[in-house]
A protein has these predicted regions:
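PRPP-associated nucleotide enzymes
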Residues: 1-313
Length: 313
């Protein structure tokens, strides 16, 4: 009996449709047809408008804004499972709820663990994501997780800038590992920002560990939310004699007054990805598309090839 060839099909959640189309283009495929029906009370229902029986399907969608996009992904996974897809991969460029990776005070949930269980229960047989806020989230899943790093895009970009006296900086102690990995690749020094918070998104004090005077500084982080930490760090570094301050952040949440803070700060440039759709444009924000990265990895996953070269920290 001849071996049955498994077809690969790519679908997008509604809020990530532009990125999904770009990924499909780089993959060399046509984006699959999904109908999103919405009831008058706000409830919605996705339906695949083509057969996916026996296929390997990739469902692309970032979970930001968190609740509705997550629910849409879960419903699409469930629909794919019930339609007898053979392999169901949830491609989640930005994995929301990742800041809830541990119980850091009494009577709080571990949200990231819960989301992992929901995705698997809904039907995901594999997860592809990028720059998780906490690496240990991979261990919350029983299914395979391909955790990609945007550094495979950012590092060549930074190298092409040919900056003299380059210093890599982390905006907090938690990002020190990432900063040292970038610094090793770029053969540069490292600076760490030490900050104290009054509450979430409110910084009471910040200090620098390391020298920035006469340096071109690049801050590296996995996400930028309100941009409070980022802009405060940039302004402090310029006060301490830095020649310039740029930032590299994978996921541009850019909520609240983030764009205004960036425009008013001494940050020269924010380099980010399209893992989350932009709310507005800014001359200071440079977006590098992650579509080709995901397309390559999805192609290798489908053809059972290694993706190790994409694991540049």
């Amino acid at each position: 009996m001849a071996k049955v060839k498994i077809e690969a099909k790519i679908f997008g959640c509604s809020q990530s449709m532009e990125l999904a189309k770009n990924i499909a283009d780089h993959y060399g495929a046509t984006l699959g047809n999904v109908l999103f029906s919405r009831y008058s009370d706000g409830e919605f229902q996705p339906s695949f408008e083509e057969s996916i029986r026996g296929a390997r399907i990739f469902i692309i969608g970032s979970t930001q804004p968190s609740s509705e996009n997550l629910m849409e992904m879960l419903l699409m996974l469930d629909a794919a499972k019930r339609a007898s897809a053979r392999h169901i991969t949830a491609v989640i460029p930005y994995f929301g709820w990742a800041r809830q990776d541990r119980k850091d005070k009494p009577r709080v949930p571990i949200g990231a663990k819960l989301i992992a269980k929901l995705l698997e229960s809904a039907g995901a047989t594999r997860i592809i994501t990028m720059d998780l806020h906490a690496d240990q989230i991979q261990g919350f899943f029983e299914k395979p997780v391909d955790h990609l790093f945007a550094s495979s895009m950012f590092l060549p970009y930074l190298k092409n800038l040919n900056l003299d006296n380059l210093t890599i900086a982390s905006p907090d102690m938690g990002g020190a590992k990432r900063a040292y990995a970038y610094a090793k690749y770029l053969e540069s020094d490292v600076v760490i920002c030490y900050k104290q918070r009054q509450k979430a998104n409110v910084i009471s004090h910040m200090e620098l560990i390391g020298e920035v005077k006469g340096k071109n500084v690049v801050l590296v982080d996995d996400m930028v939310d309100t941009a409070g930490t980022l802009t405060k760090a940039a302004d402090l570094m310029m006060e301490r004699g830095a020649l310039s301050v740029r930032a590299v952040c994978t996921h541009p949440l850019l909520s609240g007054s983030a764009y205004e803070r960036i425009e008013e700060s001494q940050l020269l440039e924010l380099i980010t990805t399209d893992s989350i759709p932009s709310r507005k444009e800014s001359k200071k924000v440079k977006v590098l598309s992650c579509a080709n990265l995901f397309a390559e990895v999805m192609h290798n996953v489908h053809h059972n090839k290694s993706i190790a070269k994409k694991f540049i920290m």
